[in-house]
């Protein structure tokens, strides 16, 4: 394994946009719900952690293996979240040296800073699903109680 592409979906009662990544991850109820990955450009795999599935041991080992290049859109967020997931103490994080951020690469080319925006500008065949955004909001963000819920 030389390259590991990663995408996670997570939950925390802390508002990410108001509080930032570190406070979001430090919340006692923080959890990674879904872990999507691809090894060396192969087929994408999704591990449903919320339903008890486990990330393969070789993939967990690759997270801290400097010989494996990790790719993610907003890699800093994924790296900090995964640091907590693998049990590093608060304030200690996976070394960023072998991580590459496709959001930063997009920004250097003048592309939008959202995955949805990059896909639209580049007219990619596979776009981020708008339905997915609604589902992420429903499952990954706390909601205020209403009569309906």
Residue spans of the language-model regions?
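Active-site-proximal helix-loop-helix substrate-binding element of RNase H-like nuclease domains
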Residues: 30-32, 36-37, 41-149
């Amino acid at each position: 394994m030389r390259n590991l592409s990663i995408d996670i979906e997570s939950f925390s009662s802390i508002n990410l946009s108001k509080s930032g990544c570190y406070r979001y991850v430090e919340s006692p109820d923080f959890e990674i719900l879904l872990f999507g990955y691809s090894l060396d450009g192969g087929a994408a795999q999704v591990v449903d952690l919320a339903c008890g599935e486990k990330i393969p041991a070789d993939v967990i080992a690759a997270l801290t293996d400097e010989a494996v290049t990790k790719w993610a859109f907003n890699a800093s967020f994924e790296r900090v979240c995964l640091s907590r997931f693998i049990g590093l103490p608060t304030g200690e994080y996976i070394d960023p040296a072998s991580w590459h951020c496709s959001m930063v690469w997009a920004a250097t080319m003048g592309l939008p800073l959202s995955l949805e925006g990059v896909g639209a500008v580049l007219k990619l065949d596979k776009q981020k699903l708008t339905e997915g955004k609604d589902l992420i909001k429903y499952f990954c963000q706390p909601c205020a109680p209403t009569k309906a819920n």
